Amino acid sequence: DFSDINVRDGAALIHQKGLDAIARFEKGDAFDQASVAAASPRPTVGIVSGLYELFPDNDMVRRSLAGMAQAVEPGGYLLYTGQPWHPQLELIARALTSHRGGQAWVMRRRSQSEMDQLVDAAGFEKLAQRIDEWGIFTVSLARRRNP
């Protein structure tokens, strides 16, 4: 996460749950390919949750996914989320202004197909998907192909 507050609270939660041996929460830039790729030790599972839909630029998403593909071992997994639509887009845009200098943060709703194509182009094969009963949120699982 890029927020010191989120890193502090996330690390505290990991410790509170007794997961220090298997998890950590670090500060970083999810859209900096080299930074993501440098994850050490190399993860067997990468998770991107509630992030890509907040940014309109597919080049940013491509860089992030390319870094994930470099970081995650072949045969490892990527869990990623999507929001193909949302009934409260205007409310969300007006509420999420902290990272945009007070400007509205308009959610980029990618179709599931578009998101899956970005994941595939990065070197992952989609295996499964779940969607909530309202069709708002998706969670997908993909496996890192051998380069």
Please state what every model-predicted region is.
Residues 32-41:
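Short conserved loop adjoining the S-adenosyl-L-methionine
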Residues 61-74:
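A short glycine-rich, Lys/Arg-flanked "PGG" loop and its adjoining helix->strand segment in the class I
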Residues 1-32:
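Class I SAM-dependent methyltransferase SAM/SAH-binding core
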Residues 46-50:
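A conserved beta-strand element that flanks and buttresses the S-adenosyl-L-methionine
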Residues 122-147:
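Core SAM-dependent methyltransferase catalytic element
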Residues 106-123:
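Short alpha-helix
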Residues 74-83:
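Conserved beta-strand signature within the Rossmann-like core of class I S-adenosyl-L-methionine
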Residues 87-105:
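Short, glycine-/aromatic-enriched active-site segment of Class I SAM-dependent methyltransferases
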